Amino acid sequence: MVLTLVVMGVIIVLAVAPTGMCSFEPGRPENGPVREVDAGTFLHMEAASLGVPVRDPGVPEGWTSNSARRSTAGGEEAAVTGYITADEGYLQLTQTGASERDAAATEGREKTGEREVAGATVSVYAADSDEVRDVWAIDLGETRALISGAAPESDWETLT
């Protein structure tokens, strides 16, 4: 039985290797080029169709918008854009008309405090689990902006 498995493994390797569809590179993976999307155009189109104001955060030089999609947050439609920061961190900005609590208090998150950033009050939502990322929520009147991701706190403040 073991011999049969070895023979099958050799046959599979011999059949797949010439296709060039497989590769093995031991060591740490390297980041490839970031595919850029036009977040400004996406947000402009979303502002026209969501029924709530959507803002373009105007990210600093060195940041790249790499994703834009429509999703839901708190049961309402939402515009979601993702950004690779200059330090290769990642932040996601979700804009929705849902209430702050409905949009941010998901996956076991609870409001853990507030802070002032650039003149805005930011509500911080966190969960007990390390697998659930924190969310910063900013009430912009008719719209709530939610920031989540993996980047230094200074980048979170920049996106606010």
Model region roles, listed by residue range:
Residues 21-36:
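Ser/Thr/Pro/Gly-rich low-complexity linker/stalk segments immediately outside membranes or between
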Residues 16, 113-160:
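A short, solvent-exposed beta-edge/loop patch
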Residues 33-128:
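Short, solvent-exposed recognition patches
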Residues 2-20:
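Hydrophobic membrane-insertion alpha-helices, especially the h-region
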Residues 17, 42-46, 159:
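Residues that form generic nucleotide/phosphate-binding pockets
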